[in-house]
């Protein structure tokens, strides 16, 4: 009887959270371990309504092995017809007192990071998004070879309010 109740609560929770996420169009994650500076996290987007406007986010899950207060990323969106948009981004990961900005229980925190707003995917075909870490230690020219503490990298598309 107790396990049936636990299963019911689990299923109810999943339904509750999935029904509250009406803005979500795309939300995928890639698990990583010791993110190498040359490794790309890739996402392919297909069948996105070209008449709508969207907001884009990068989702990062980190644990206490992440030793930095910020995160530098290089992103690239490849459009179906060949156009490419590249960005170098910096995000704060902690408050000034060192407390994580992300939400979550235990060691793992999740940060939903604004990437772009009011984006139209007006070309038909597949879009490709790549995300690469670009972290360096203070004073170093070379990037950090293996970035510890990032457990998952995600890409999310939401319907825009505009």
From Swiss-Prot:
Signal peptide (UniProt feature, chain positions): 1-19
Coiled-coil features, chain-numbered ranges: none
Highest taxon of source: Bacteria
A Gene Ontology cellular-component term: plasma membrane
Topological relation to the membrane, as annotated: Lipid-anchor
N-palmitoyl cysteine: lipidated positions: 20
Keyword tags: Cell membrane, Lipoprotein, Membrane, Palmitate, Signal
InterPro entries: Motility-assoc_lipoprot_GldH
Protein location: Cell membrane
Lipidation, S-diacylglycerol cysteine type: 20
Miscellaneous: According to PubMed:17107561, motility has not been observed in Gramella forsetii although it possesses genes known to be required for gliding motility.
Record NCBIfam families: GldH_lipo
The name this protein goes by in its record: Gliding motility lipoprotein GldH homolog
Source species of the chain: Christiangramia forsetii (strain DSM 17595 / CGMCC 1.15422 / KT0803) (Gramella forsetii)
Gene this chain is encoded by: gldH
